[in-house]
Amino acid sequence: MDLSKRSAENVEYMIEQLKQKLKVMNFDALKPSHFSEEWYDELKDIYEMVMKRETFSPSEMQAIVEELGNLRKK
């Protein structure tokens, strides 16, 4: 998948991958429709950082989820 291009499909892909990697239990909290392409670069940065790591501490998980929450459409 070419994530260098901003698109709704790429946003959806990254959110779905983040949910799997982070084992998000509340799937409704991370719906692709909650995210705008306006924040694409920030979302991509989070996605790339998460995909590089194998594990996360509880505080890191909380920080990632909070940051994703900041990127959600208001």
From Swiss-Prot:
Superkingdom to which the source organism belongs: Bacteria
InterPro entries registered for this protein in UniProt: UPF0435 (IPR009507)
Q: Which family does it belong to?
A: Belongs to the UPF0435 family.
Indicate what this protein is called per its UniProt record. Answer: UPF0435 protein GTNG_0390
Organism for this UniProt entry: Geobacillus thermodenitrificans (strain NG80-2)
